[in-house]
């Protein structure tokens, strides 16, 4: 993650954070450096750009789910993630806001116990239901704008399958690839994460 922000490597605005940045990029980070690296990176970005940071964390629970069958490894990951997330998301003055997604329901116990002001929205919540994918109107406009209005029902049959709150939405990745490839029907979304913890 740090290597994606190479502009920080010689930033005159980082002060003592420059040493942390270089330790992480050089592979010399301590466990503490790693557990606080997201908070520290957000601070570095604010110092460099002069703006608060938005943190987006997708599949926050992926490594925990993968280690579910190994209690010792699972606990190590839970302990690390508790520090990693709480330092990044609580009391971080460089943070504007954060969005965290995952398979497991976010609970104020466990790894999020250190956080307050936590707003949890799940697939049944109406508040952001239209923001989890493309709506019917958006897909129709996209297809019409790409001279493919006759493909609307086909796209609905293949890629409309999610319901958040009270709205049916399309998988954006699938729709983008479908349109980009000349409306060629295919399974564009590959499930790369494990949901074994839910299956149990």
Which residues are covered by each model-predicted region?
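Phosphate-binding site recognition
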Residues: 1-200
């Amino acid at each position: 993650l740090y290597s994606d922000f190479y502009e920080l490597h010689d930033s005159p605005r980082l002060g003592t954070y420059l040493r942390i940045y270089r330790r992480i990029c050089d592979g010399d980070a301590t466990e503490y450096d790693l557990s606080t690296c997201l908070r520290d990176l957000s601070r570095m970005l604010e110092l460099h750009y002069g703006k608060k940071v938005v943190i987006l964390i997708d599949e926050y629970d992926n490594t925990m789910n993968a280690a579910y069958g190994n209690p010792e490894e699972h606990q190590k990951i839970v302990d690390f993630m508790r520090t990693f997330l709480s330092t990044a998301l609580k009391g971080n003055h460089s943070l504007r806001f954060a969005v965290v997604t995952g398979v497991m329901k976010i609970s104020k116990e466990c790894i999020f116990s250190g956080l307050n002001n936590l707003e949890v929205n799940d697939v049944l919540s109406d508040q952001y239901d239209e923001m989890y994918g493309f709506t019917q109107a958006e897909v129709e406009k996209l297809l019409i704008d790409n001279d493919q209005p006759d493909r609307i029902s086909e796209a609905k049959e293949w890629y409309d399958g999610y319901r958040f709150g009270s709205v049916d939405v399309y998988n954006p990745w699938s729709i983008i690839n479908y349109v980009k490839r000349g409306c060629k029907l295919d399974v564009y979304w590959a499930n790369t994460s494990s949901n074994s913890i839910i299956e149990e």
